[in-house]
């Protein structure tokens, strides 16, 4: 397992090199990341069958949609709770949403969906957050934390600063975090560890 911890900027640079210089498409990296999260969920939460994926509109949310589809195909009960303005969705997110539509995976915008979940997947922000969480995002994060289900964070718990581990106003308190390619500097701080729970570094992502 890779021991090196890197910053958000370093991770973005590695992603961009892989996509632009090597030529591995972003959607391929997204699929590999999502497969790693799926595998972790099937290993650590094999009985989960009322899974709610909380997905933002960026590529972390796109990961979440791909994870929802992979869990659905694996026979798990899964629904998607969307947050944010879909008009601002990344192109990869839009592609994943189209695929989820094909599989008829339930999609909702009402956080009441969290009440009956037996597992929650946090795919709101990932490594990208650089300002305090506010508004509807803060509300949903608080509702995730108030739910009785365990939480798996995708890459970094939403609301945690990737570089420092600081809580950006409010943050998801995860039981398990699957982070991609390398650990992140914020996740090895005391506060980052407290919010990330157990950290799995999925280091076979094809990112160079």
Curated annotation (Swiss-Prot):
> Which reaction is this enzyme known to catalyze?
(6R)-NADHX = (6S)-NADHX; (6R)-NADPHX = (6S)-NADPHX
Write down what this protein is called: NAD(P)H-hydrate epimerase
Q: Name the EC number(s).
A: 5.1.99.6
Q: What class of enzyme is it?
A: isomerase
Give UniProt keywords alphabetically: Isomerase, Metal-binding, NAD, NADP, Nucleotide-binding, Potassium
Cofactor(s) of this protein: K(+)
Residue numbers binding (6S)-NADPHX: 59-63, 126-132, 137, 155
Isomerase as a keyword of this entry, yes or no, is yes
Q: What does this protein do?
A: Catalyzes the epimerization of the S- and R-forms of NAD(P)HX, a damaged form of NAD(P)H that is a result of enzymatic or heat-dependent hydration. This is a prerequisite for the S-specific NAD(P)H-hydrate dehydratase to allow the repair of both epimers of NAD(P)HX.
Q: How is the cofactor bound?
A: Binds 1 potassium ion per subunit.
């Amino acid at each position: 397992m890779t021991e090196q911890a890197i910053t958000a900027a370093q991770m973005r640079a590695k992603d961009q090199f892989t996509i632009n210089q090597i030529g591995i498409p972003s959607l391929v990296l997204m699929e590999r990341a999502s497969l790693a999260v799926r595998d972790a969920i099937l290993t650590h939460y094999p009985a989960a069958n009322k899974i709610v994926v909380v997905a933002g509109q960026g590529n972390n949310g796109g990961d979440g949609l791909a994870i929802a589809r992979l869990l659905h195909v694996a026979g798990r009960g899964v629904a998607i709770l969307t947050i944010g303005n879909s008009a601002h969705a990344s192109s990869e997110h839009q592609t994943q949403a189209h695929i989820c539509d094909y599989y008829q995976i339930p999609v909702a915008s009402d956080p009441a969906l969290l009440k009956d979940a037996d597992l929650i997947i946090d795919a709101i922000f990932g490594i990208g957050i650089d300002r305090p969480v506010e508004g509807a995002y803060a509300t949903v994060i608080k509702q995730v934390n108030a739910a009785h289900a365990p939480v798996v964070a995708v890459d970094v718990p939403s609301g945690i600063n990737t570089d420092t581990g600081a809580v950006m106003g409010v943050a998801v308190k995860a039981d398990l975090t699957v982070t991609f390619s390398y650990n992140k500097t914020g996740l090895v701080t005391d506060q980052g560890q407290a919010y990330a729970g157990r950290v799995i570094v999925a280091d076979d992502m094809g990112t160079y």
